[in-house]
UniProtKB/Swiss-Prot annotation:
The gene is UFM1. Changing residue 81 to C: In HLD14; decreased ability to form thioester bonds with UBA5 and UFC1; decreased protein ufmylation; does not affect the cellular response to endoplasmic reticulum stress. Keywords: Cytoplasm, Disease variant, Isopeptide bond, Leukodystrophy, Nucleus, Ubl conjugation, Ubl conjugation pathway. Ubiquitin-like modifier which can be covalently attached via an isopeptide bond to lysine residues of substrate proteins as a monomer or a lysine-linked polymer. The so-called ufmylation, requires the UFM1-activating E1 enzyme UBA5, the UFM1-conjugating E2 enzyme UFC1, and the UFM1-ligase E3 enzyme UFL1. Ufmylation is involved in various processes, such as ribosome recycling, response to DNA damage, transcription or reticulophagy (also called ER-phagy) induced in response to endoplasmic reticulum stress. Belongs to the UFM1 family. It comes from Homo sapiens. Induction: Up-regulated by thapsigargin. It holds the Pfam family Ufm1. This is Ubiquitin-fold modifier 1. There is a cross-link at residue 69 (Glycyl lysine isopeptide (Lys-Gly) (interchain with G-Cter in UFM1)).
Amino acid sequence: MSKVSFKITLTSDPRLPYKVLSVPESTPFTAVLKFAAEEFKVPAATSAIITNDGIGINPAQTAGNVFLKHGSELRIIPRDRVGSC
């Protein structure tokens, strides 16, 4: 089984820390979101993953589909920051 890698950046931190995650392409993207949120110590239930262009990603698909549609560079935003200036 092949793997896909994502570089996920935490946009709510001014230092823009990132993590690189490699997961099997059949992994549910909800699991990727949950793991990334835990790594950044933000609540997974109130976080969203978006593309660098600001397009939200529906987590109800596999990691392989997300990789094919959106590429490897993604951002995680805690939802308390969504829409704030």
